[in-house]
Swiss-Prot record:
The gene is ugtP. HAMAP family: Diacylglyc_glucosyltr. It is an enzyme of class 2 (transferase). Processive glucosyltransferase involved in the biosynthesis of both the bilayer- and non-bilayer-forming membrane glucolipids. Is able to successively transfer up to three glucosyl residues to diacylglycerol (DAG), thereby catalyzing the formation of beta-monoglucosyl-DAG (3-O-(beta-D-glucopyranosyl)-1,2-diacyl-sn-glycerol), beta-diglucosyl-DAG (3-O-(beta-D-glucopyranosyl-beta-(1->6)-D-glucopyranosyl)-1,2-diacyl-sn-glycerol) and beta-triglucosyl-DAG (3-O-(beta-D-glucopyranosyl-beta-(1->6)-D-glucopyranosyl-beta-(1->6)-D-glucopyranosyl)-1,2-diacyl-sn-glycerol). Gene3D superfamilies: Glycogen Phosphorylase B. CDD domains: GT28_Beta-DGS-like. Its EC number is 2.4.1.315. The lineage of its organism: Bacteria, Bacillati, Bacillota, Bacilli, Bacillales. This is Processive diacylglycerol beta-glucosyltransferase. Pfam families: Glyco_tran_28_C (PF04101), MGDG_synth (PF06925).
Length: 388
């Protein structure tokens, strides 16, 4: 039995999802009394220049680099068993060895497909349990390695795909993707309507426009939607200050029809009152939408995991996928008018959702390492406390 285990969570800053999952797991471990938890961006610390270049190329995949990313994602999938696997397995290895020597972790978790640890296990024989937490509704071969002890995946579909490519079923646990605990609280929606000055008698369209590549014509689209009766449009611009300032002028023409926000810390609050949401199909965003049963309109998925996520949610009846700018207004307006379709999509989201995935993952890891959790009460957010 490990009395006070040290947990090392390896991640990478390609988008916010991998890091967000790492932070959620870190918080969950701490809630269960495991205080010694380290989150490390292994690639960023090992090769900062290469990482900056690849992050830039990753962001360009949302605009001019879609075909390049398609070639990378699906091309690597086909040739992964050859030379690329050997090169990638050693990426970050020097920094990893120093990290393991300095920190001496008892448990290693990957929220990004980093196979340096299992490869090091294979080559040196070190004994340390390694867990991979997949952050999409699909799987790429780059996540798979014989020295990984267990995989935590979003759905049974992902598990079946992994079994088909040779991963033993007993090594795969269907838990869902870890999301922030705020998405699993019960909150009185009336408080949210008042906080954001929204009308509970109108439908609400949420546009998450801060994400990379979401809707190049947000301003024109908002102007079109403002003419739709009994509809309020809420746009979250994130850290895109230029977009926010551009939309503020539009909002001033009809502040009841359009609400514009920058970065919203508790975005789950807006999820709870929206009728449907336009967004990009990132694994974490879709998991959060599933938790609160929000029908989604997925805008122009990038080839790779985004496209795989979008196709899965479309097959399940939980999403409408739009691949052409000219379709956005018409398809969104039609969906907002179709209450039966919206209800069916909410039910589909409910069927996809797996409750408390972070707890499930952490409890499984602690049990396998014979660690007894010591739950620490966490104070609920102020808005959640107002629920009656």
């Amino acid at each position: 039995m490990i009395k006070n285990p040290k947990v090392l969570i390896l991640t990478a800053h390609y988008g916010n999802g991998h890091v967000q999952v790492a932070k959620t797991l870190e918080q969950t471990f701490r809630q269960k009394g495991i205080k010694d938890v380290i989150v490390c961006d292994l690639f960023g610390e090992s090769h900062p220049v290469i990482t900056d270049i690849t992050k830039y190329l990753y962001l360009k995949s949302y605009t001019i680099g879609k075909e390049l990313y398609r070639l990378f994602y699906y091309g690597v999938e086909k040739i992964y068993d050859k030379k690329i696997a050997s090169w990638y397995a050693n990426f970050g290895r020097k920094r990893l060895k120093l990290l393991l020597q300095a920190e001496k972790p008892d448990i290693v978790i990957n929220t990004f497909p980093i196979i340096a640890v299992p490869e090091l296990k294979k080559q040196t024989g070190i004994s340390i349990p390694v867990y991979n937490v997949l952050t999409d509704f699909c799987v790429h071969k780059i996540w798979i390695h014989r020295e990984v002890d267990r995989y935590f995946v979003a759905t049974d579909h992902v598990k079946k795909v992994m079994v088909d490519i040779g991963v033993p079923a007993e090594q795969i646990v269907e838990t869902g993707i870890p999301i922030r605990s705020s998405f699993e609280l019960k909150i009185n929606p009336d408080i949210i309507y008042n906080k954001y000055q929204l009308c509970k008698n109108k439908k609400i369209l949420l546009i998450v426009a801060g994400a990379h590549g979401v809707l190049g014509s947000v301003k024109e689209l908002c102007q079109s939607f403002m003419s739709v009766p009994d509809l309020q449009v809420v746009v979250v611009c994130g850290k895109n200050e230029a977009l926010k300032q551009d939309l503020v002028g539009v909002q001033e023409t009809n502040p009841d029809a359009l609400k514009v926000f920058g970065y919203v810390e508790n975005i789950d609050e807006l999820f709870r009152v929206t009728s449907c949401m336009i967004t990009k199909p990132g694994g974490i965003t879709l998991s959060e939408a599933a938790a609160l049963q929000v029908p989604v309109i997925l805008y122009k998925p990038v080839p790779g995991q985004e496209n795989e996520n979008a196709m899965y949610f479309e097959r399940k009846g939980a999403a409408v996928v739009i691949r052409d700018d000219s379709e956005v207004f018409a398809k969104t307006e039609a969906l907002l008018k179709d209450d039966m379709k919206l209800l069916q999509m909410k039910e589909a989201m409910k069927s996809i959702y797996r409750p408390e995935p972070a707890d499930h993952i952490v409890d499984t890891i602690l049990a396998e390492n014979h660690v007894e959790p010591n739950h620490i009460p966490i104070k609920s957010p102020a808005l959640a406390q107002s629920f009656t």
